[in-house]
């Protein structure tokens, strides 16, 4: 089994679930091309009011479970010019990422017994350079003998991400009011 093919299949379903919730989706990877992490982050960071979700199929963990990771704490860096270093773009969003991650993890736990109750922290390369609430969703496990076991998880994972994003939106997106400055 190729992890990249399975992830793309999951991504299609996640996209549909998010669109059903009314979200516009921009994918940073659409096929077997392999954009760099920096290119993916640049695409994500160009969006306004966005959240970032990266999907992975792990080779570890209890098969049939799913985990959400948020970036570990990033120590603040004081730059005299006021700019945030690229590899610390996530720092201002850590609290929002935790909230988003916990919501998605709660929905995953309802679907996949044995999954953790809350998002976990890890140093995830792709999240560090993302200037938006960002989570990594990891599905276990690529080591299953029958790919159909993973394929059966895709709708539940997609639904959990869609529902989590919808639940998170009010805490992140402030609606515009007529006459107010954006």
Model-derived regions, located:
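Active-site-proximal helix/loop segments of hydrolytic enzymes
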Residues: 1-182
């Amino acid at each position: 089994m190729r992890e990249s093919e399975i992830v793309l299949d999951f991504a299609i379903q996640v996209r549909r679930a998010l669109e059903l919730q009314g979200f516009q989706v921009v994918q940073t990877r659409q096929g077997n091309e392999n954009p760099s992490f920096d290119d993916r982050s640049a695409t994500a960071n160009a969006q306004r009011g966005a959240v970032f979700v990266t999907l992975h199929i792990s080779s570890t963990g209890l098969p049939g479970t799913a985990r959400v990771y948020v970036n570990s704490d990033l120590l603040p860096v004081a730059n005299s010019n006021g700019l945030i270093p690229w590899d610390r773009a996530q720092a201002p969003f850590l609290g929002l990422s935790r909230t988003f991650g916990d919501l998605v993890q709660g929905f995953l736990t309802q679907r996949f017994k044995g999954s953790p109750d809350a998002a976990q922290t890890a140093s995830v390369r792709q999240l560090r350079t993302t200037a938006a609430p960002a989570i990594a969703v990891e599905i276990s496990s690529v080591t299953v003998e029958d790919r159909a076991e993973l394929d059966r998880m895709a709708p539940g994972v997609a639904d959990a991400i869609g529902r989590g994003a919808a639940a998170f939106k009010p805490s992140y997106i402030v609606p515009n009011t007529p006459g107010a400055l954006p």
